[in-house]
């Protein structure tokens, strides 16, 4: 009897340790901080797949603003760019992408100033939407400086709290349609 109870306890412990949480795209924005290092399943429509590497996918819910950033895991092939608009079911661990505070912005700003204006620097609009910032079209200002300014405004709106961005490190996915 003791062996049976021990076996049941061991199985329950293993199952609870490997718990996978299902979250919607909208829930991810508010729950990601509590889910760091945990495995999640997120289902959403591929709004954009990075055109440079194909290793970054942005999931959305049609008609909603929220986005979830998904990176391919180690050893995975890039996402297929022709699947933009398809529904993905992604499994992976939640991780912190970056913590943006005043020190981070000061360092970034110094790097931009030292490197000079970068003609033709492209800022991915989808990435900015995922970060929750809105860049105003200003052709006279360096796009990176616009981005820094927008982050400072967002930090001020948050009462000085840093901006923490999260992503899902994909371990597997399926395309549903």
Show which residues each predicted segment covers.
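OB-fold and OB-like single-stranded nucleic-acid-recognition modules
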Residues: 17-177
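Sec-dependent bacterial lipoprotein signal peptides
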Residues: 1-15
């Amino acid at each position: 009897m003791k062996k049976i109870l021990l076996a049941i306890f061991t199985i329950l412990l293993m199952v609870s340790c490997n718990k996978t949480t299902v979250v919607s795209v909208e829930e991810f924005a508010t729950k990601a901080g509590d889910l760091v290092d945990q495995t999640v399943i997120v289902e959403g429509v591929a709004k954009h797949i990075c055109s440079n590497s194909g290793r970054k996918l942005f999931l959305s819910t049609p008609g909603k603003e929220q986005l979830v950033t998904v990176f391919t895991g180690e050893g995975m092939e890039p996402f297929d760019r022709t699947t933009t608009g398809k529904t993905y079911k992604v499994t992976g661990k939640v991780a912190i992408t970056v913590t943006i505070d005043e020190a981070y912005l000061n360092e970034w700003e110094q790097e931009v100033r030292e490197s000079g204006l970068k003609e033709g620097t492209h800022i991915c609009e989808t990435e900015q939407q995922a970060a929750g910032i809105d860049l105003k079209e200003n052709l006279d200002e360096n796009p990176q400086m616009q981005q820094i300014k927008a982050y400072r405004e967002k930090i001020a709106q948050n009462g000085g709290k840093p901006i923490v961005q999260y992503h899902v490190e994909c371990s597997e996915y399926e395309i549903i349609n």
